[in-house]
Amino acid sequence: MNRFLIFCLPLLLPFSIVAQDNKEKPAVTYEELYDEPYSVNKLFIGFQPLYGELFATNANAGFGVEASYYYKDKLDFKAHFRKTYSSNFFDFNRQAALDNSDLDFTNKPQIFNYFELGGTYHIKDFDGAGKTKMVLYKKSLRGNKWAANVPLRAEVPCKVRKIYGVRLGGIHWKSTVDLNRALKEQGLTNADLVNNNGEGLLPINPITGAVRNVGVFSNLSTTNIYIGGSAAWFRNVAVSFEKYEEGLDDGLLTLFFDVIFAPGLTLDPVTYLGQDYSTNAVKTSSFGFRAGIDGKFNRTMSWSYGGEVGIRPSIAGQGFYMMFKIAFPVFGTNLDYKVESFGK
C-alpha cells in the first residue's frame, strides 16, 4: 500500500499544482477607457540606431531614419534611408577593398546606402471584434518582486482594425562588390574583364613577369520598382483594471510581400592603370522578392521594429538577404494642433 502511494504521489503532484494555480487566479473586472483603432497618429518619424543586414553581395550594418504617414483610411506612405556607420562598422566589402585593393586600381569603394519610398492603397479597411491579452501589473511588485513574479494576463475583448492593401514603390541602393568572389562563383577569371582593346585584366609582376593575384572590387548601383500586398492589424484600446494598473494595447502590425524588378542595374567598370575594364561578363539578376514585418505603437514617443527576408536584384547568385531594424525613439503625432477659441 505504501509503495502504491509513493508511486501515485508524483503523478498527482502536477494536478495539485494546477488546481492551486487556478485557485490563485481570481477573475478581474475592468472598465473600458477607450477602444478606437481608427484614432491613430497620422505621422511617425523614427531614428534607427541599429540595423543589420546579412546580404550575400555585401554584409552590412549601420543606422537609418524612417517616416510613415497615414492619410485617413485610404492610403499610407513610407520613406526610409539607411547607411553604414563606417567601413569598420560595418561595411564588409568596402573594408575589404580598402585593405586589399592594389594601388594601381583607382575605383573608390562605395559606402553602402539604401533609399526607399513607397505607398499602400487600402483596398479594404474595416474593423471587427477581436481580443487582446494584457499583463496585470501592480506597483507593489516593482523591481525584484516583479522580476521574481510570474505575471498574470487578462484576455480583453476589443476592436481590431484590419487593412488589406496594395503596395507600390521604389528602392535605390549602392554598394561595393567583391568581383573576385563573383567571378569565381560564375566560373570566370580576371581575364574576362577586358578593356577597349580586348585585353584581359592580367596584372603582371614587373620583377618575375608572372600574373599577380590581386583583389578586384567594383561598385554596384541599382534602381528598383516593387509591387506587392500587405495585411495590417491595428489595436488602440485601454482599460482600467480593478486592483491593478491600467492596461494598454496600441500595437500597429503590418505584414507584406513584394515582387521586385530592377530596370536600372549598373556594375561599374574596373579602372586599372588609367584604363577601364568592362564588367559585362559578370552576370546580374534584375528580379527579386521579399517578405517582411513592421511593428510600432500608437504613442507620442515609443519604439518600432521590423525585418525582411528575400532575394534582391544584384550579382547573379548573390541576391539573398535577411535584415532586421530597431528604431528608438519614434515620435508620433496626429498633426491636429487646432484649438477652439471663443470671444468674450
Give the label of every model feature segment:
Residues 58-126, 224-226, 233, 259:
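Glycine- and aromatic-enriched membrane insertion/assembly motifs of diderm outer-membrane
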Residues 43-51, 63-69, 79-85, 162-174, ...:
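Transmembrane beta-barrel strands of outer-membrane/channel proteins
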Residues 20-86, 90, 173-177, 329-331, ...:
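Short glycine/proline- and aromatic-enriched beta-strand/turn motifs that initiate or cap beta-hairpins
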Residues 19-44, 128-159, 241-250, 333-344:
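Outer-membrane beta-barrel biogenesis signature
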Residues 171-306, 311-317:
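Outer-membrane beta-barrel transmembrane domain signature
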Residues 116-129, 318-344:
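Outer-membrane beta-barrel "beta-signal"
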